[in-house]
Curated annotation (Swiss-Prot):
Biological process terms in GO annotation: chloroplast organization; translation
Organism: Arabidopsis thaliana
Protein's UniProt name: Small ribosomal subunit protein eS21z
GO molecular function, one term: structural constituent of ribosome
Coiled-coil blocks: none
Lineage of origin: Eukaryota, Viridiplantae, Streptophyta, Embryophyta, Tracheophyta
Pfam family, one: Ribosomal_S21e
Keywords associated with the record: Acetylation, Ribonucleoprotein, Ribosomal protein
Length: 82
């Protein structure tokens, strides 16, 4: 919900898992949000980052590493097309 000035006033904003598109509920204490920094050709941080959210289910199954790798490969392909 937003106030008259357009600022978000909610305490909880629901998120979706980037790997499975499942809703991350407020009681999912095993979920994580990762900010992965972008690097230039010299390996220096450019100030930009990409955010991925992983639900506890993905982490409990042991698929977090492969999920992040798959998401990052997809992100790199999208960046090359632009």
């Amino acid at each position: 919900m937003e106030n008259d000035a357009g600022q978000v006033t909610e305490l909880y904003i629901p998120r979706k898992c980037s790997a499975t598109n499942r809703m991350i509920t407020s009681k999912d204490h095993a979920s994580v949000q990762l900010n992965i920094g972008h690097l230039d050709a010299n390996g220096l941080y450019t100030g930009q980052f990409t955010t991925f959210a992983l639900c506890g289910f993905v982490r409990a199954q042991g698929d977090a590493d492969s999920g992040v790798d798959r998401l990052w490969q997809k992100k790199k392909v999208e960046a090359k097309q632009q």
